[in-house]
Regions:
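A "functional boundary" signal
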Residues: 24-272
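Bacterial N-terminal signal peptides that target proteins for export
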Residues: 2-13
Length: 272
């Protein structure tokens, strides 16, 4: 299944959520209505749907331009291009990341293997991901946080989509353990906001730590703290970026937990 198909499936799910939320908005009593923000966001949302293909063309042009200016025989270049393809064209991402796994420099080979495992887990190839995970030891210390994150994702996907209950429980425990290890590892670092590329993917440990802190606060029902963390990040990142969408969606989940229907709809639209 290609990334494009997966994207369409996720879009259908999002549209269903939005349609339900909008229908509820339409029948709410008038005293609950915000002045104009929901209507404005709905108009923006319609415009963004119409211009979706322009973003695809923009990304394609950016990748093609970058490929023409760097040495594509170098593992680091292959990793860079492979990561850019991940949310856009799955087959190309697999191709370039697989090439980079043959790098003679151990850290580059294992870095690309970790990205490849993450991608394989995302598209349902769990067995291949687990097989590759057995090739990672010994692991360069610089990749420890990425290793924890990747294995948490791999076990998490296997838990959600697995069929055997005993194995699902095993993967759930493993995912939780790796997430805890990642949380501890990130907290031990002196992390600060750094430049976030419009096309960046999973490269900013400060953002990952903030996301984990937000989720932890939400799980503890400390919604004020969760919203504060989200606001801190959203003030730093630009709209119309992948990072903004992620944290806007996390904010959506907070307001859903709080049963704040208007704020839920507002942030659902912003995240989309």
């Amino acid at each position: 299944m290609t990334t494009t198909v997966i994207g369409r499936i996720r879009l259908v799910g999002l549209l269903c959520s939005l349609n339900f939320a909008v229908s509820m908005y339409a029948i709410m009593p008038s005293y609950t209505m915000p002045t104009s923000i929901v209507d404005s966001l709905l108009n923006v949302y319609d415009t963004e749907i119409e211009s979706a293909y322009s973003y695809i063309d923009e990304r394609r042009n950016y990748i093609d331009s970058l490929k023409s200016t760097i040495d594509m025989t170098l593992p680091q270049s292959q990793i860079t291009i492979g990561k850019l393809y991940i949310p856009y064209q799955c087959d190309s991402a697999l191709f370039y990341l697989s090439q980079a796994t043959h790098a003679t420099e151990e850290i580059r080979a294992k870095e690309s293997t970790l990205y490849l495992i993450y991608l394989l887990a995302s598209i349902g190839y769990y067995n291949e991901g687990f097989i590759l995970s057995n090739t990672l030891q010994p692991l360069p210390p610089e990749l420890l946080s990425q290793y924890y994150e990747t294995l948490a994702h791999l076990h998490g996907e296997a838990f959600v989509y697995g069929k055997m209950e005993e194995l699902k429980q095993f993967h759930q425990r493993q995912a939780a353990a790796y997430k805890d290890s990642l949380f501890i590892a990130l907290q031990q670092k002196e992390l600060a906001p750094t430049y976030i590329s419009r096309y960046g993917w999973k490269e900013n440990e400060w953002l990952e730590l903030k996301k984990m802190q937000l989720i932890h606060a939400r799980e503890q029902q400390d919604y004020e703290q969760a919203i504060s963390i989200s606001n801190e990040v959203l003030e730093y990142v630009a709209p119309n970026t992948h990072t903004y969408a992620i944290f806007a969606y996390e904010t959506t989940c907070i307001y859903n937990d709080m049963q704040e229907s208007i704020e839920y709809l507002v942030w659902l639209l912003r995240s989309s």
